[in-house]
Amino acid sequence: MVKKLFFIATLLYIGATVSAENYLVKSPDGKIVAELNTNKSLSLQFKYNGSILLQESSIGVTLNDGMDMGKNPKVASHKLSNHKETIHAPFYRQQNFETGYQELNLKLKNGFGIILRAYDEGVAYRFYTQRKGKTIILNETAAYQFGKDKKAWLPYTTTPEKPFAMAFQNIYHETRLDTAKQDLAFLPATVDCGKAKVTILESDLEKYPGMWLKANSSELDKEKGILRAAFAPYPKEMAYYPWRHMSHVKSACDYIATSTGKRNYPWRIFAITEHDTQMPTNNLVYALAAPNKIGDTSWIKPGKVAWDWWNDWNLKGVDFKAGINFETYKYYIDFAHNHGLEYIVLDEGWYNSKEGSILKPIDDIQLPKLIEYGKSKGVDIVLWAVFNVMDENLETICKTYADMGIKGFKVDFMDRDDQTAIEMVERLAACTAKHHLILDLHGIYKPHGLNRTYPNILNYESVFGMEECRWTEAKNDMPLYDVTFPYIRMMAGQVDFTPGAMRNGTRDNWKAIYTKPISMGTRCHQAACYIVQDSPFTMLADTPTNYEADEPYTRYIASLPVVFDKTIVPQGEIGKYIVTARKKGNNWYIGGQSNWDERTLTLKFDFLTDGDYEAIVLKDGINANHDAEDYKIEKSVINQKSELKIHLASGGGFVIKIIKK
């Protein structure tokens, strides 16, 4: 629900005879000024506290009839207005938040228009068209000019030979723009402009491909530090891989989208943050997304999950053969029940994925019996599926499994973000919501606010998460990544990082083991993921028998909430460390993580209300630099005037539960 309060606004209407000029919008606090220039071409620039962050940058949309919004724009009218909103945000990092903006609606001739907004948190624009019939969009142009000496954090495609076909999982490359690779980079991406950082995102992506960025497309781009937009072309012909019945683009058209002539285009967002600690809680993507389309959300249950795939179904000391069978999943359900976890996920293997026979569960799991057993223990079941396999028989699959008692799907292997992929995800979101099924989206592009529109989408992957520990190389520095992506990727939305490793490695002794994976960094670094990361549907990724071997630690992480009333980041620096504090009811939860550098932090608790609190601290043990599994639990009484020094080992972390007395 959105409550819009429109206060006195300056409304300025200018007729069709207006000459080309500049149009300004200012953020409510006056720090951000964005300017649209309509002289010969359409361009955007903006300043923060008087310093130029984005230099004059050309933008536009080209249609197949030859119309180009960015060339020789003719202004028909413009309207300037001011707005405030209070946004209710279920299953988000804030239960509610307020935002305000100044908006320019610039109507152009020939059925084009652009909306530009300035928030205290950044700048956003979107195109719109008001034309008859269908429209084919040849391309959208954007040449964001920052300056060649600016530093950027770019996540490149992992398949340069076929750049748009990938899982959107890569580390961030920290680089100057003029020395950046020419490979395509997916969003979000951040540029350090000196006075502030600018993070490029998008929201309300509907019937349209996702945006990518490319540096150094030409010598001119290199000289000016331009990041140029790119988009996956519209698919012409699809084919299937011989495994998982997974579809892929075999050939593509020479345009990026096909649509109706009357529509809004996606929001292009520049989140502006003076301090790194503002980055993980920037709300622009959520604020700019289309509001809730499904109505009642009381049936949606966030929670923690006992998961099979990461630990390779490894159970120790049991009297049955562990694997994809009833007895194994019964054990997972018992573990979930005994530790207060809401779900288990049945990952790949519960049906013959090569055949795509999703309506035929394998006999060994006895799915109806397993569902009934889960019900008796208060544990619900979520099923894994491949996107296109589910989409090809969507209504039947949703109804069949909802009627059976399944509560959701973990849908995997989209591996593209062309227009048809975007449309497929929305179809899945709408149909699963109709049948009261939740979604956890894997192998997918970054969030773009669809979780606001369809709140049954509880999580997204699009992260270099814990699965990488099964096969990656040590050079892909995960502790570094873990204190980088919360500042950048999490601006886009929640993240299914799948933490919880009980086998933990130091910088010197970590290695990839596919069947018995080890995390990089300490066990407390893993625990901190549950607080640092926005994740309302989150895994306990290791095997139940590993957790049962350390009940104090397991019960500690199992007791942590997954949704919160408020989130702040009191301390942190991108690529070095992060400290996140979240409020739930009268209690607070703090999580902190470091890169491979040891550090000692002084924590203050001035965000607490009056009174005493019990602080239950989970922290790296004295020998955690040698044995990353070493930890300690301590208790003390604190109040809002207290300070606490806490040491983080190399790749370390901590969690504090702060319980009101």
Question: Over which residues does each language-model region extend?
Answer:
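Conserved, mostly hydrophobic/aromatic
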Residues: 336, 412, 439, 532, ...
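N-terminal accessory beta-strand-rich subdomains and adjacent acidic, glycine-rich linkers
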Residues: 22-287
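An acidic-aromatic substrate-binding cleft motif
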Residues: 256-335, 339
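Carbohydrate-binding surface patches
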Residues: 573-614, 654-655
